[in-house]
Curated annotation (Swiss-Prot):
GO terms for cellular component: cell outer membrane; cell surface; extracellular region; periplasmic space. InterPro entries: AC_1 (IPR043990), AIDA (IPR030930), Autotransporte_beta (IPR005546), Autotransporte_beta_dom_sf (IPR036709), Autotransporter_pectin_lyase_C (IPR012332), ESPR (IPR024973), Pectin_lyase_fold/virulence (IPR011050). It holds the Pfam family AIDA. This is Antigen 43. It comes from Escherichia coli (strain K12). Interaction with TamA of the translocation and assembly module (TAM) initiates insertion in the outer membrane. The keyword Nucleotide-binding does not apply. PROSITE patterns: AUTOTRANSPORTER. The signal peptide, cleaved at the inner membrane, guides the autotransporter protein to the periplasmic space. The C-terminal beta chain translocator domain inserts in the outer membrane via TamA. This domain probably forms a hydrophilic pore for the translocation of the passenger domain to the bacterial cell surface, with subsequent cleavage. Finally, the mature protein remains tightly associated with the bacterium. Keywords: Cell outer membrane, Membrane, Periplasm, Secreted, Signal, Transmembrane, Transmembrane beta strand.
Length: 1039
């Protein structure tokens, strides 16, 4: 093979092939020193399965096309065109250990090379390449010259002595300009992916050497490190230059330049939309800021010899150092003092605490921010200029209209806050004659004096309690009053076609005058009268509560809003159109005579809103608040909640049309269903219901049916006496099995009792009822003896029980429930003629009742005493040896006295109740000998006292049909009020006839123990007599 004359060769043993191979030391060195090349060659031949191809392009030789892959090498001393390189980065980017790819040696040239992922083009000193395109994952290591390289995600590493001209850096490409290198006419289209001033550093251009005439386009970034220099850079919109080293003659055509600590920028020109930012420790000299350009100097930054052209912006604070000239002449910001500064087009000066500013000009788009404790004098505010301050600053100057203003000593006078301006009034300070034209006025307490004006989007934000004793006016456009509390004896004046929104505020003023436009109250509590002009609109939204009158305007109440209309308002409430989904209440703070209030509405659109009206059912005239529909229509649905404003126990029967609560006048109409009654109104014995009349007005009328509590309370007498009679029982319920010894009996009984509907309370009958009862009774004989051929037994008993009865109104609707807890004590005397069996049973009983009557609207309690006397007789006849027939007759007389009381609609009084009952019937049953005899149990402990089986027990059964007649029942119940004529008396009758059937079974289970069970049913066949069913179990022990 023909080689270059200075080529030397070396035999290298290949362990894989087991033979010596020849390696060109110069070729393999690729410009590196020989020892390194030999070591790398040995590594290659011992690590690769076959020796990689080694292609040499000799001087004068030209190779067109071809691809390097799989660790191939091309050493170029001549010329290559159109090569594709896909290998060479075996050890990663910019690594000296890499040996593959294309190596352009001294005198070699490579044109239009394509480097793909994993490919390496190395240009050694004296070598040159042009028009190389490097894709993502590929790289160019440059020590020679490269012209017009394109980095399409690829990388270019410039080592000492390298020169790169016309490099284009596209998406995620990276050019590293190391010390001792020069990159000229670079175009940077990537690098800013991390956002403004992000130090991502691995895309775009990274300069540690020299970068000349760089163009930075949108999304491009040049980072100039401390040892780097960038000269004559142009930065377009969306691109930026980050300077830690030196930047000379940079032009910002919409792009940004960031000068960091230790960095310097000289002779920068900032054109329209360009922005130079000098950070803490950064230095900029001789910057020129043209129209719409911006220079920002942060605290600790320095910019000297600045030329600020008209329309250019300066953004800085008194903690920075800035000197130069502007359209007013020389200006400076040095050591906390600013003088002759012009602020416009986004310019801003922050005057910090303890610092000063003099002769400041604030024009359109400029902002002067004077912090608490800062001072700004001779301020000239132009149209569109923004002032930010609070009452702890000291500011004086002229407004855009030429008027003087000042802030100082806790007093602000004649401030004008344009859009973007902000002033904060601190607690204890005062702001007089403030005008807010689209700006923000924040009051943290303090006092508003003179005329405070809000226009064109102005915002007044309150924090804490602020006082206004003068006038808060809105003249043009929209305005917002939000938060906190505004109190005082001042007024709010709303003019102009815009909207004033009061949000989350407590507003208490002498008046709100709504002259034009719309007033929206949102989630606020407002206590004042709203005096409006026709054609205006008032909206109550959210959870707003308005306490005051409205006259006159169009009103909208949202579902959560409330309007309280006081009876002491300065004007009568008059509304044109009312759209109502909220709550309206008539309220009063007056004592003494009832004075009804009136709300007049032209058109009402009800949206399930409520109106609470005060009503005096105990008064014949002027007895209710009133809604007046004047000449318009009432549509939709409005709920009227009725409040008894007088004695809650008062109530009269209405006469005529009733109590007027909605009045239609001047041809007004109301739809059927436009108003519904939201709650029951009760007074005395009456319910009052809402009715629409033919005159389109609505009235409350006392109902023909009495309120639910009337039958409920009337049933209490009947329920208590029914219970007493059941407890007293009859002889068959008491005496059990006859015997010669005294006995003790324990009985448990439960059942159902009630009364049918026989015309109800209106017809003098006992109200319809149905319920249950239960009791436990313990009784015992005290004496058993024989006197003059008669057996005499005397004893006492006690019982405790409970009954619960549901009562219905005359129309069948539920009236309520009466519950009774009762305790009884009684005595009895039994007389039995020994020879004939004729017997008589005498019972006397007293019961203490504790009763509670509950309806939907009331809970009423009463206590009382019941008494009862009973005489019963019977004569048994034997039909067979074991079958007996016993005719029976019983007379019972009972009484009841309940305490008087009152509920929330009136008093309740009970007269003495009484009733007489006669029962006639017979008892048919077995009459077996109940002698226990000898025990037959097979268990030793029970052998003498128990039977072997149930069939051996002595048992008797019986049935007892009867007719019960109730007569002479009395019992008055009176309800009413202290108002003359309001009381009514009801005397529900219990008279009637019922059929009763009882049946039982008795068994002697021990010599001295008898068990009995019984069940019965009573059915009313006439009148209001009681009916029901019962069950009982009795344990009888003799001794």
């Amino acid at each position: 093979m023909k080689r270059h004359l200075n080529t030397c060769y070396r035999l290298v043993w290949n362990h894989m092939t087991g033979a010596f191979v020849v390696a060109s030391e110069l070729a393999r060195a690729r410009g590196k020193r020989g020892g390194v090349a030999v070591a790398l060659s040995l590594a290659a031949v011992t690590s690769l399965p076959v020796l990689a191809a080694d292609i040499v392009v000799h001087p004068g030789e030209t190779v067109n096309g071809g691809t390097l892959a799989n660790h191939d090498n091309q050493i170029v001393f001549g010329t290559t065109n159109g090569m594709t390189i896909s290998t060479g980065l075996e050890y990663g980017p910019d690594n000296e250990a890499n040996t593959g790819g294309q190596w352009v040696q001294d005198g070699g040239t490579a044109n239009k090379t394509t480097v793909t992922s994993g490919g390496l083009q190395r240009v050694n000193p004296g070598g040159s390449v042009s028009d190389t395109v490097i894709s993502a994952g590929g790289g160019q290591s440059l020590q020679g010259r490269a012209v017009n390289t394109t980095l399409n995600g690829g990388e270019q590493w410039m080592h000492e002595g390298a020169i790169a001209t016309g490099t284009v850096i596209n998406d995620k490409g990276w050019q590293v300009v190391k010390p001792g290198t020069v990159a000229t006419d670079t175009v940077v289209n990537t690098g800013a992916e991390g956002g403004p001033d992000a130090e991502n550093g691995d895309t775009g251009q990274f300069v540690r050497g020299d970068a000349v005439r760089t163009t930075i386009n949108k999304n491009g970034r040049q980072i100039v490190r401390a040892e780097g220099t960038a000269n004559t850079t142009v930065v377009y919109a969306g691109g930026d230059q980050t300077v830690h080293g030196h930047a000379l003659d940079t032009t910002l055509n919409g792009g940004y330049q960031y000068v960091h600590n230790g960095g310097t920028a000289s002779d920068t020109v900032v054109n329209s939309d360009g922005w130079q930012i000098v950070k803490n420790g950064g230095v900029a000299g001789n910057t020129t800021v043209n129209q719409k350009g911006r220079l920002q100097v942060d605290a600790g930054g320095t910019a000297t010899n600045v030329t600020l052209k008209q329309g250019g912006a300066l953004v800085t604070s008194t903690a920075a150092t800035v000197t130069g000239i502007n359209r007013l002449g020389a200006f400076s910001v040095v050591e906390g003092k600013a003088d002759n500064v012009v602020l416009e087009n986004g310019g801003r000066l922050d005057v910090l605490t303890g610092h000063t500013a003099t002769n400041t000009r604030v024009d359109d788009g400029g902002t002067l921010d004077v912090r608490n404790g800062g001072t700004a004098t001779t301020v000239s505010m132009g149209n569109g200029g923004v002032l930010l301050a609070d009452s702890g600053a000291a500011v004086s100057g002229t407004r855009s209209d030429g008027k003087a203003f000042s802030i100082g000593g806790g007093q602000a006078d004649a401030l004008m806050l344009e859009k973007g301006s902000s002033f904060t009034l601190n607690a204890g300070d005062t702001a007089t004659d403030t005008t807010v034209n689209g700006g923000l006025f924040t009051a943290r307490g303090g006092t508003l004096a003179g005329t405070t004006t809000l226009n064109n989007g102005a915002i007044l934000t309150l924090s804490g309690k602020t006082v206004n004793n003068d006038t808060l006016t809105i003249r043009e456009g929209d305005a917002l009053l939000q938060g906190g509390s505004l109190t005082g004896n001042g007024s709010v004046e709303k003019s102009g076609s815009g909207t004033l929104t009061v949000s989350n505020t407590t507003l208490t003023q002498k008046a709100v005058n709504l002259n034009e436009g719309t007033l929206t109250l949102n989630d606020s509590t407002v206590t004042t009268d709203v005096i409006a002009q026709r054609g205006t609109a008032l909206k109550l939204t959210g959870s707003t509560v308005l306490n005051g009158a409205i006259d006159p305007t169009n009103v909208t109440l949202a579902s959560g809003a409330t309007w309280n209309i006081p009876d002491n308002a300065t004007v009568q409430s008059v509304v044109d159109d009312l759209s109502h989904a909220g709550q309206i209440h008539f309220t009063s703070t007056r004592t003494g005579k009832f004075v009804p209030a009136t709300l007049k509405v032209k058109n009402l659109n009800g949206q399930n809103g409520t109106i609470s009206l005060r009503v005096r059912p105990d008064m014949a005239q002027n007895n209710a608040d009133r809604l007046v529909i004047d000449g318009g229509r009432a549509t939709g649905k409005t709920i009227l909640n009725l409040v008894n404003a007088g004695n809650s126990a008062s109530g009269l029967a209405t006469s005529g049309k009733g109590i007027q609560v909605v009045e239609a006048i001047n041809g007004a109409t109301t739809e059927e269903g436009a108003f519904v009654q939201g709650n029951r109104l009760q007074a005395g014995a009456f319910n009052y219901s809402l009715n629409r009349d033919s005159d389109e007005s609505w009235y409350l009328r006392s109902e023909n049916a009495y309120r639910a509590e009337v039958p409920l309370y009337a049933s209490m007498l009947t329920q208590a006496m029914d219970y007493d009679r059941i407890v007293a029982g009859s002889r068959s319920h008491q005496t059990g099995v006859n015997g010669e010894n005294n006995s003790v009996r324990l009985s448990i009984q439960g059942g159902h009792l009630g009364h049918d509907n026989n015309g109800g309370i209106a017809r003098g009958a006992t109200p319809e009822s149905s319920g249950s009862y239960g009791f436990v009774r313990l009784e015992g004989d005290l004496m058993r003896t024989e006197v003059a051929g008669m057996s005499v037994t005397a004893g006492v008993y006690g019982a405790a029980g409970h009954s619960s009865v549901d009562v219905k109104d005359d129309d069948g609707s539920r009236a309520g429930t009466v519950r009774d807890d009762a305790g009884s004590l009684g005595g009895y005397l039994n007389l039995v003629h020994t020879s004939s069996g004729l017997w008589a049973d005498i019972v006397a009983q007293g019961t203490r009742h504790s009763m509670k009557a509950s309806s939907d609207n009331n809970d009423f309690r009463a206590r009382g005493w019941g008494w009862l006397g009973s005489l019963e007789t019977g004569l048994p006849f034997s039909i067979t040896d074991n079958l007996m027939l016993e005719p029976q007759l019983q007379y019972t007389w009972q009484g009841l006295s309940l305490d008087d009381g009152k509920d929330n609609a009136g008093y309740v009084k009970f007269g003495h109740g009484s009733a007489q009952h006669v029962r006639a019937g017979f008892r048919l049953g077995s009459h077996n000998d109940m002698t226990f005899g000898e025990g037959t149990s097979s268990r030793a402990p029970l052998r003498d006292s128990a039977k072997h089986s149930v069939s051996e027990l002595p048992v008797n059964w019986w049935v007892q049909p009867s007719v019960i007649r109730t007569f002479s029942s009395r019992g008055d119940m009176r309800v009413g009020t202290s108002t003359a004529g309001s009381g009514m008396t009801f005397s529900p009758s219990q008279n009637g006839t019922s059929l009763d059937l009882q049946a039982g079974l008795e068994a002697r289970v021990r010599e001295n123990i008898t068990l009995g069970v019984q069940a019965g049913y009573a059915h009313s066949v006439s009148g209001s007599s009681a009916e029901g069913y019962n069950g009982q179990a009795t344990l009888n022990v003799t001794f």
